[in-house]
Amino acid sequence: MLKLILMMIFISPICFMQGLFWMVHNLLFVITFVLILMNFCLNYFVNISYFMGFDVLSYGLILLSFWICSLMIVASESVNKYNNYKNLFLFNVLMLLIFLVLTFSSMNLFMFYLFFESSLIPTLFLILGWGYQPERLQAGVYLLFYTLLVSLPLLVGIFYLYKNCNTMNFYLLSNYMFNCNLLYLAMILAFLVKMPMFLVHLWLPKAHVEAPVSGSMILAGIMLKLGGYGLLAVFSFLQLIGLKYNYIWVSISLIGGVLISLVCLRQTDLKALIAYSSVAHMGIVLGGLMTLSYWGLSGSYTLMIGHGLCSSGLFCLANITYERLGSRSLLINKGLLNFMPSMTLWWFLLSVCNMAAPPSLNLLGEISLLNSIVSWSWLTMISLSFLSFFSAAYTLYLYAYSQHGKIFSGVYSFSGGNIREYFLLFLHWFPLNLLILKSEVCLFWI
C-alpha cells in the first residue's frame, strides 16, 4: 500500500521540471497498470500497513481514481499549450490523487474523514485557479459550504463512536450495531451531500459549469463516488437503524431523480445538462444502496464505476466542442454532425452508455439497482419507470440537439479531432464496455 503512495510522492518533483508534462501522465499510467497487476479481488482487507488497506470496493475506486487522473492530464492540453501555470496544475492533480487514494484505502474512520475533507482543497484550487468565468468564486463557495457544513456532525459522530467503542477501525466497528437516531443522521448526512442527494445537490451543477475540464472530470468521476463509498462504509454498523429510516432517503432520491430529469430536459448549457444527469444517476445509486440488499449494494458499486467513466467522457466531449466553438450553449452547438463528423461517433457511444444501453457497465448497474429497489417496494416502480424513460429522453435530447439541426451561422469552418482526443475518449469508453465481460469483479464483492 505504501509503495503506491511513495511512487506518487516521488512523482511530485517531476511536476516542476520543464518539458515533462507528459512524463507525469505516463508515470500515472504505469502506476495504474501496476495496480491492475496487483489484482486484489478479495472481499476482506489485504495489504494492510498501519491505517491503510485494500478491499475490493476501495481497489476498484482507487483504480478509477488513477485512470481518471491520468486522463485529466490528457484532457488539459490547453493548460500545457498556453503554459497556464502547468507545473502547479500537475502538482494539484497529483495531490488530489494522493488524497483520494488515501481516502479509499483508510481503515480508520478518522483518517477517512481527514482525507475525505482534504480532497476538497485541491478540487477548490482547480475550480478557482483554472475555471473559465468569474462566477467560479461563487461555485467555490457553494462547494465549500455545502460540504463543510455537514461534515462537522460527521466529525462529532466519529468522536462519539470512539468514546463508546474505543476504536475507529472499520473492521472492528462492524461488530457493533447502533440504534441512535442522531448518530445515524450525523454519520450519513455528509455523504448524502457528497453524493449528491436531491435537495442538497445545488453545489454540483454550479461547480461543474464553472470548473475546467479536469475539474469536471474529477468531480463527476471520483468526488461523487466518495459519498457512495462513505455510505457503504458506515452502513456496516448502522444496519438496524438504517432499515428503520432508509425509506426517507429512497423516496427523496427516486422522486428527486425524476424531477432532476425534467430539469435536464430544459437545459441549454451542455455542461449543466451532463451535471444534472449525474445527480439523476446518483439518485438511483443512493436508492439502491439504501435498500441494503445484496443487489442494491453491488449494483450501486457497479453504477458508480460505470457512471464515473461515462460522465467523465461526456465532459471531455463537451470541452472538445467548447475549445472549437468557444461556447457551451446548445443553441450554438448545433449541427455538429457537419462540423466535426468524426466526433459524432463518440457523442453517440458515450450518450448511449449514459442512458444504460448494452453492453455498458451502466446497464448492469441499473438492472441490479432496479431489481433491488423494486423488491424493496412495488410502489417504486412508478418513479423508476419515469426515471428510466426521462433518462433516455434527456440523453437523446443532448445527442440530437447537438449533432443534428441547422448549423449555427457563426461557425465558418469544419474541424477534425486530433489523436489525443480520440485516445482520451477511447480510454473512457473502452473500459466501460469491456468491464461487462468481467462483471464478477463489480457484482460479487460482498
Curated annotation (Swiss-Prot):
Keywords: Electron transport, Membrane, Mitochondrion, NAD, Respiratory chain, Translocase, Transmembrane, Transmembrane helix, Transport, Ubiquinone. It catalyses: a ubiquinone + NADH + 5 H(+)(in) = a ubiquinol + NAD(+) + 4 H(+)(out). Its main location: mitochondrion. GO terms for molecular function: NADH dehydrogenase (ubiquinone) activity; ubiquinone binding. It comes from the Eukaryota. GO terms for biological process: ATP synthesis coupled electron transport; electron transport coupled proton transport. The chain crosses the membrane at residues 4-24, 28-48, 56-76, 88-105, 109-131, 141-161, 182-202, 218-238, 245-265, 272-292, 297-317, 330-350, 373-393, 426-446. It is a multi-pass membrane protein. It is found in: Mitochondrion membrane. GO terms for cellular component: mitochondrial membrane. Its EC number is 7.1.1.2. Belongs to the complex I subunit 4 family. Core subunit of the mitochondrial membrane respiratory chain NADH dehydrogenase (Complex I) that is believed to belong to the minimal assembly required for catalysis. Complex I functions in the transfer of electrons from NADH to the respiratory chain. The immediate electron acceptor for the enzyme is believed to be ubiquinone. This is NADH-ubiquinone oxidoreductase chain 4. It comes from Ceratitis capitata (Mediterranean fruit fly).
